[in-house]
Amino acid sequence: MNIVITGCSKGIGAELVKLWSQDNMVFGISRDIISLKKIQKNLKRPSNFKFIAEDITKLTVNQLNTWISVDSIDVLINNAGFLINKEFEKINYDDYKKVMDINFWGSFRITQLLIQKLSVVNGHIVNISSMGGVNFSSKFPGLSLYSSSKGALTILSECLAEELKSYNISVNTLALGAVQTEMLNKAFPSYKAPTSAKEMAEYIISFCESSNKILNGQIIKVSKSNP
């Protein structure tokens, strides 16, 4: 399979690259070129990972076509995320723009760019949201901007599940609970999550490889704890 993963330099994204690249071609994007090179160097099959160190919100068509040289993409994982832990009254426009650009607009844009490649093979788009971005879940002080951005991504998924039916593309959302990553440490510094990044990556891979045949437009809560 050909797989595209955004936000793949750390945490769950990095674990997805390590696992999926053993038997598949993985295309990754992140701004952190040092981490991308380190991941590639330590892979069992380094040639199965082709990355671009670029801001996902500024990716051009020419850059994408150079980076992803194949005609079809089986799975797109919109995993890129950024968190600012700040009291609501102190959030400014720069905070808003950075979080929304990465957590929402980046996923929006790369999905637009890959529709044709995904349509070739009845592709599967999986948007990585958060328990904080869905209804009827606990919300936490300082995370209003992050949760709102993930809520926007969740609604986008539902819209695209309908709009992309004509392309035979399935779109689903995984709303993740607490996973032990750097981002969790930023949100909850003293908290120890019950799920590791590798464990969550294994679940995501299993979901992506099978669920597009029977699911579309679904929001799946994947959580042992929140946080």
Task: Identify the residue ranges that each predicted region occupies.
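Conserved NAD(P)H cofactor-binding loop of Rossmann-fold oxidoreductase domains
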Residues: 79-85
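Catalytic loop of short-chain dehydrogenase/reductase
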Residues: 124-152, 157-158, 162-165
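C-terminal helical subdomain
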Residues: 173, 189-227
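Conserved glycine-rich cofactor-binding loop
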Residues: 9-10
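Conserved Rossmann-fold SDR core element
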Residues: 154, 163-179, 214-220
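Substrate-binding pocket helix/loop in short-chain dehydrogenase/reductase
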Residues: 87-88, 95-97
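Conserved glycine-rich Rossmann-like NAD(P)H-binding loop of the short-chain dehydrogenase/reductase
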Residues: 23-38
